[in-house]
From Swiss-Prot:
<feature type="modified residue" description="Phosphoserine">
    <location>
        <position position="249"/>
    </location>
</feature>
<comment type="pathway">
    <text>Protein modification; protein ubiquitination.</text>
</comment>
<feature type="modified residue" description="Phosphoserine">
    <location>
        <position position="409"/>
    </location>
</feature>
<keyword id="KW-0227">DNA damage</keyword>
<dbReference type="GO" id="GO:0070530">
    <property type="term" value="F:K63-linked polyubiquitin modification-dependent protein binding"/>
</dbReference>
<dbReference type="GO" id="GO:0005654">
    <property type="term" value="C:nucleoplasm"/>
</dbReference>
<feature type="modified residue" description="Phosphoserine">
    <location>
        <position position="368"/>
    </location>
</feature>
<dbReference type="InterPro" id="IPR051657">
    <property type="entry name" value="RNF168/RNF169_E3_ubiq-ligase"/>
</dbReference>
<keyword id="KW-0479">Metal-binding</keyword>
<feature type="short sequence motif" description="LR motif">
    <location>
        <begin position="689"/>
        <end position="701"/>
    </location>
</feature>
<dbReference type="GO" id="GO:0004842">
    <property type="term" value="F:ubiquitin-protein transferase activity"/>
</dbReference>
<feature type="modified residue" description="Phosphothreonine">
    <location>
        <position position="554"/>
    </location>
</feature>
<keyword id="KW-0862">Zinc</keyword>
<feature type="region of interest" description="Disordered">
    <location>
        <begin position="491"/>
        <end position="555"/>
    </location>
</feature>
<feature type="modified residue" description="Phosphoserine">
    <location>
        <position position="693"/>
    </location>
</feature>
<keyword id="KW-0808">Transferase</keyword>
<dbReference type="GO" id="GO:0005634">
    <property type="term" value="C:nucleus"/>
</dbReference>
Length: 708
């Protein structure tokens, strides 16, 4: 290895590249000819003496194989390419900088990493290749190694040499990942730990498997013992609470006394009758099922006798005061279906002995076509619907079973309801609830905002509500003392018929008042106790039709008839007007007086000026004449007063003048009372928030604000 540095090698490589290849080859040929004694190219022909092949040294490698692929010179610092060729440092630098192919020999472009490696860190490879080239061709590498000084001089004689020594083996120590046997030791230790854990868990699992069956057997044995101890008590309790428990089928024997709640369909036949406990007044008795239409009285009697004898000691005597069926609605006129039995017969029976209860016979449903029951024909084909609820009864904390009180409805014969009365023996609470429901329905009907399709006469003017509602919707009542010119007398108004009162129980309570008020045949008082019931669609029309059957056919009577029919619909006042102020007259409102076009009063005055104003329609079905409500109300009131003044209701007649003054005074008093009532209600609804009062606003504290 020469001692010259890299700069010397680079300069020698540049100088060698500058020389002509041909001149160098010529000089090499001349030198070889001088050594062998052969003439040069300028001399004449001569024989070439070859050495024997045994003494001939091995041929050196071709320069294309060992030299640079670019300049064909033995590289001092070679760079290996991926294709197998080598380049000197200069050619490798030019190949890396150029955009062309990487290898000038095979035109194979190396990858980027190869080019970067050849450019940057190809020092080690170049040294190895240079050492190989110097060993293989020492004669050709010596002038370049010596700086080119001996290149022009004669070359030393080539001596035969032995085969080139093989390059030294470069040993590189392998990377040690682990020591020998270390992985096996680690695996063995992990396996031992796993086996130890399994050995520790195995005894506990075995113990658990042993204890589980024992615990299960112990729990089952305790449950069986508890069940055996409780079974007699349950049987005893069931027998006490349901002594008349019957089987669900006629072919089965009665059950052992256990109250197994069966949820059957509503159309399944039930053979249970009312239990004795329910008839004895116990609230925890079982609710009975309805009877089937196809069952006969004999079969029910047999099943009842079959279930009763074991429970004779449990029956107690019953008094009428302890009877809990007072809330059940009864009908004394119509026949009953089996789903709603007639309990009035059972109320009259003495409950002191069991034999009377065993022989109790419920009325069978009539199957004849002349039956009063309106649904009997349908129920001949279908089984009756079970009236009792299918949900199990509620159990009280003390263990008693609370059975709900069932109100059974009764089908009514609608053909007979118009001729005969039907009395309801019900509790006052139910009657009060009925009346409340009727009033609520009437209020909803009156306050409805729906568009009217027909103008019923003054149907929207009636309201059931507070005084404020009365003040905005009602019209004051006017009594006009008119005597018919023909001398005819109106028939006495006796109120709604008994058939109409069947639909309204609260009206039947006030019949005595109506009968006491209707004293003379010339007076028609205004019935005002139950306004919502008297005005109900078809019943109202039948009312008007019945109450005027006794009237004559004269025009005056017809006019009075229309006035009376209108007066009967204004029934929202809670008292009847004094009898002394209504002397044989017909009650009308101021609004209804406008509808009279021609009406002869007693003094002969013809009322014609009333026909100038049109008939006002319902409030809900027409537009308001004024933009604001209070102006319209005040305007209508002024118009009414002007109209009454224009008509001049016989100023010479003291009775009419006194009547009008009294009505005006009553109207003013009523308006004042309503205004005061509204002020009082407003003050009562207004909450005083002043400081110091009970309802004052409390300041929000900081902690409450922070919490939010």
């Amino acid at each position: 290895m020469a001692a010259a540095g890299p700069s010397t090698r680079a300069s020698s490589a540049a100088a060698a590249a500058a020389l002509s290849r041909r001149g160098r080859r010529g000089r090499c040929d001349e030198t070889a000819a001088a050594k062998t004694g052969a003439p040069g190219p300028a001399s004449g022909p001569s024989l070439l003496v070859l050495s024997p092949p045994l003494l001939q040294p091995p041929l050196p490698p071709r320069p294309e194989e060992s030299g640079c692929a670019g300049c064909l010179e033995p590289p001092g610092e070679a760079a290996a390419l991926p294709c197998g060729h080598s380049l000197c440092r200069g050619c490798a630098q030019r190949a890396a900088d150029a955009a062309g192919p990487g290898c000038p020999r095979c035109r194979a472009r190396g990858p980027g990493w190869a080019r970067r490696r050849a450019r940057d860190d190809g020092q080690a490879d170049s040294e190895v290749l240079g050492e190989c080239a110097r060993r293989s061709q020492p004669e050709r590498c010596r002038p370049r190694r010596d700086g080119g000084a001996a290149a022009a001089g004669p070359r030393p004689e080539q001596e035969p040499r032995a085969a080139p020594a093989e390059p030294d083996f470069i040993f590189r120590a392998p990377i040690k990942l682990s020591k020998p046997g270390e992985l096996r030791e680690e695996y063995e230790s992990l396996r031992k730990l796993r086996e130890e854990k399994l050995q520790e868990e195995k005894p506990s699992e075995d113990q658990i498997h042993k204890l589980l069956p024992e615990d299960t057997e112990t729990g089952k044995r305790k449950m069986d013992e508890q069940k055996k101890r409780d079974e007699p008590l349950v049987l005893k309790t069931n027998l006490e609470r349901c002594p008349a428990r019957l089987s669900d089928s006629e072919n089965e024997e009665p059950s052992r006394g256990q109250m197994t709640q069966t949820h059957r369909s509503a159309f399944v036949s039930k053979n249970n009758s009312y239990s004795l406990a329910f008839l004895a007044g116990k609230l925890n008795s079982k609710v009975e099922r309805s009877q089937s239409c196809s069952d006969t009285a004999q079969e029910r009697a047999k099943s009842r006798v079959r279930a009763v004898p074991g429970n004779k000691a449990k029956v107690t005597t019953m008094t009428p005061a302890s009877n809990p069926i007072i809330g059940v609605l009864l009908s004394t006129q119509n026949n009953r279906c089996v789903s709603a039995p007639d309990l009035t017969i059972e109320k009259r029976l003495p409950f002191s002995s069991l034999s009377s209860l065993a022989s109790l016979h419920k009325p069978e449903r009539s199957v004849s076509p002349e039956s009063n029951d309106s649904i009997s024909e349908e129920l001949n084909h279908f089984k009756p619907i079970v009236c009792s609820p299918c949900t199990p009864p509620k159990r009280l904390p003390d263990g008693r079973v609370l059975s709900p009180l069932i109100i059974k409805s009764t089908p009514r014969n609608l053909n007979r309801s118009l001729q005969k009365q039907t009395s309801y023996e019900a509790s006052p609470r139910i009657l009060k609830k009925w009346e409340q429901i009727f009033q609520e329905r009437q209020i909803k009907k009156t306050l409805s905002k729906a568009t009217l399709t027909s103008l019923a006469p003054e149907m929207g003017e009636e309201l059931l509500g507070s005084e404020g509602i009365h003040s905005s919707k009602e019209k004051p009542l006017v009594a006009v003392n008119t005597r018919l010119s023909g001398g005819q007398v109106l028939s006495e108004y006796t109120g709604p018929t008994s058939a109409d009162l069947d639909h309204f129980p609260s009206v039947s309570q006030t019949k005595a008042e109506q009968d006491s008020d209707n004293k003379s045949s010339t007076e028609i008082p205004l019935e005002t106790c139950c306004s919502s019931e008297l005005k109900g669609g078809g019943s109202g029309t039948s009312l008007e039709r019945e109450q005027f059957e006794g009237l004559g056919s004269t025009p005056d009577a017809k006019l009075d008839k229309t006035c009376i029919s209108r007066a009967m619909k204004i029934t929202t006042v809670n008292s009847v007007l004094p009898q002394n102020s209504v002397l044989g007259g017909v009650l009308k409102t101021k609004q209804q007086l406008k509808t009279l076009n021609h009406f002869d009063l007693t003094n002969g005055v013809l009322v014609e000026s009333l026909s100038e104003e049109p008939l006002p329609s319902l409030r809900r079905g027409r537009k308001r004449h004024c933009k604001t409500k209070h102006l319209e109300q005040n305007g209508s009131l002024k118009k009414l007063r002007q109209t009454s003044g224009e008509v001049g209701l016989a100023p010479t007649d003291p009775v009419l003048r006194e009547m009008e003054q009294k009505l005006q005074q009553e109207e003013e008093d009523r308006q004042l009372a309503l205004q005061l009532q509204r002020m009082f209600d407003n003050e009562r609804r207004t909450v005083s928030r002043r400081k110091g009062s009970v309802d004052q606003y409390l300041l929000r504290s900081s902690n409450m604000a922070g919490a939010k």
